[in-house]
Amino acid sequence: MADFWGGYLWPAIIIVLQCLAIILPMLGAIAYLTYAERKVIGAMQMRKGPNVVGPFGLLQPLADGVKLFLKETIIPTGANRAVFIIAPLMTFILALIAWAVIPFDAGWVVADINVGVLYLFAVSGLGVYGIIMAGWASNSKYAFLGGLRSAAQMVSYEVAMGLIIIAVILSAGSMNLSDIVEAQRQGVWYFIPHFPMFVMFLVSILAETNRAPFDLPEAEAELVSGYNVEYSAMPFALFFLGEYGNMILMSGITAILFLGGWLPPVDIAPFNWIPGIIWFFLKIALILFVFLWVRATFPRYRYDQLMRLGWKVFLPGSLIWVVLTAGFLVTFDMLPR
């Protein structure tokens, strides 16, 4: 019995607690990201935003959650019931499981694997399936077209994102996310030497998360909300939880790859007195603000413009940068040992 507790059950309980320690705060962060978005965009449009439910509207996300929870789930006639229900669950779960390899501070990671970057890339690549399944299972031409757009868009920008990440891996000499952060401790944050790729990566994560100005899969004027047009109640909410969860995830990945993860801006007092996890969350908040700022500022791209940018600008640009990075590191004997 002691062997069972020590060898199997206790480690399993610890893993479950670690997962809950990430998932529960993440759900709260997603809820209040929707509140922050409405407040920030309201301020940019010179209005108040939500201000009725609770002081300063702080209970608005809870009210929205209760409203969606109490609504009826309607499945359209002719829809594939099983796939229709699985699609939003898949989108939401994939947004959560990627956090297993994200280090919040030195040693603060659930699974510190040596191929953390590959794991993230694999999980983000699977995200498109939930949207395609939703579009196909809804038995609606608008939803189906939105799903196809999403697939083309995400695949197009994932290629460029992969090449940008290769440039960072070459500089750090590791695919372990903690090692990439520690490599930036020795020199400079990678957004300085790789600044063009940093800008490209920011634009690519906007496309990857289907956010404005690349929200073509849910273009209201053309597709009546796109792939989620037939969804209501909690399945509808799960799509938005997945979208906002992916926003936070991509912000965390950007902070790790280019902004030094949990490292302070300068390694001197009083900056290094602040815990690393605080710096990490501040960087995520900064990138999330960029998401909201872009949404309030830029009009939606046309579909052909979106594809042209991905295939004719980002793909060759990131490929050339990888070749230049590799050539520079080899020429000056700066490859990580």
UniProtKB/Swiss-Prot annotation:
It is an enzyme of class 7 (translocase). It holds the Pfam family NADHdh. GO terms for cellular component: plasma membrane. InterPro entries: NADH_UbQ_OxRdtase_su1/FPO (IPR001694), NADH_UbQ_OxRdtase_su1_CS (IPR018086). The keyword Metal-binding does not apply. It is a multi-pass membrane protein. Its EC number is 7.1.1.-. Keywords: Cell inner membrane, Cell membrane, Membrane, NAD, Quinone, Translocase, Transmembrane, Transmembrane helix, Ubiquinone. It comes from the Bacteria. NDH-1 is composed of 14 different subunits. Subunits NuoA, H, J, K, L, M, N constitute the membrane sector of the complex. This is NADH-quinone oxidoreductase subunit H. The gene is nuoH.
